[in-house]
Structures are given as structure tokens and as C-alpha cells.
Amino acid sequence: KLSGNFEIGGQDHFYLETHVALTIPGENDEYQVWSSTQHPTEVQHGVGNVLNIPSAKIDSKVRRLGGGFGGKESQATIFAAMSALGAFITQKPVKIRLNRHTDMTATGKRHNFKVFFTVGFTTTGKLLALDIKLLSNGGNVLDLSGPVITRALTHLDNCYFIKSLKAIGYV
């Protein structure tokens, strides 16, 4: 039996282009939303929810997809919604381009973790049991904190069969 704890450092997504969103009002409550996102469908639904109009009236566009390292998966929706709300109110195009400092402080990160564990094994090293608690620092932005802790919990056994496993996670 072995017990202990350790920490895993977090990581900022450092994509080259900061978050950008441009919303152009159209006819019949339709909006064209250009966003630097990895998830145009989420932007479409998020903007529709904020404006309280069907997402079918939101034309979500992205010029280039990729290179965000996960940092533009859900976070871009926030800035697209801000741009869309401004365009909705003014009925004029509204563009938001974050500077690096604002982008880094306003968006989520790859979470740092503190891990507490007790592991049981045979004298030959065969893994028998694991009792583990994961503490994930979601920081000031929850965005993907739920999916991050879920993934950590469901993948922590990796390729091992652990007959007795108790895993708890907190954000």
C-alpha cells in the first residue's frame, strides 16, 4: 500500500491569433457571425440563445479552423455573443478583437490539478486497488471545467485493469 499526493501544472492555450468576433446584422433577424472558433455550431447556438432567436437565423462562419489547441473550443462563444448582442442592439456590424492580456485573463486554461491517492498492489507489483481524489483548479472561468474533470476521472485508469477503484473529482 502506498499513499501520497502530487500536483500537475496547468497550461495556457497560446494560440497566435487572439479571440476575434464580427457580427453583421442581416434581414429578418438573421445575423452573420464570424468567429475565431474551433466550434462554429456552439457559437451558432450560443448566439441564438443570447439574442433569443432560433439558431437557424445565425450564420456562423469561421475563416480558419485549427491551431487553437482547444483554447477556442467553447471560449469563442462568449466573445461572439458579445459581438452579436452589440450588433442586435445597434443594428450595425460589431467587431471584437481581444488584446493578448485580456484574452489570457478572460479565458479558461488547461487546469492544474492536485491529486491525493492510496494505491494497493501485490508484492510483485500487480495493481489491485486505487482510491484517488482529483482537485481541479477551474480558475475564474468554468467553460470546460466539467468536461475536463469528467475526462480526467474516466481516463485515469489508462490501460490498467483496477479491480477496486474509487475516484472522486472536484472543480
For the regions a language model picked out, list residue spans one by one.
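Structural alpha/beta core scaffold segments of enzyme domains
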Residues: K1-V171
